[in-house]
Amino acid sequence: MSIADLKSRLIKASTSKMTAEL
């Protein structure tokens, strides 16, 4: 696993979290 992969995963997770809170 690369750092870029982890970063994209984190961004996806935070984005879905924000969308769910709306």
Curated annotation (Swiss-Prot):
GO biological process terms held by the UniProt record: DNA recombination; DNA repair; DNA replication
Keywords, alphabetical: ATP-binding, DNA damage, DNA recombination, DNA repair, DNA replication, Nucleotide-binding
Gene Ontology MF terms: ATP binding
Role according to the record: Important in genetic recombination, DNA repair, and replication. Possesses pairing and strand-transfer activity. Interacts with dda and gene 32 proteins.
Family: Belongs to the RecA family.
Protein name: Recombination and repair protein
Gene: UVSX
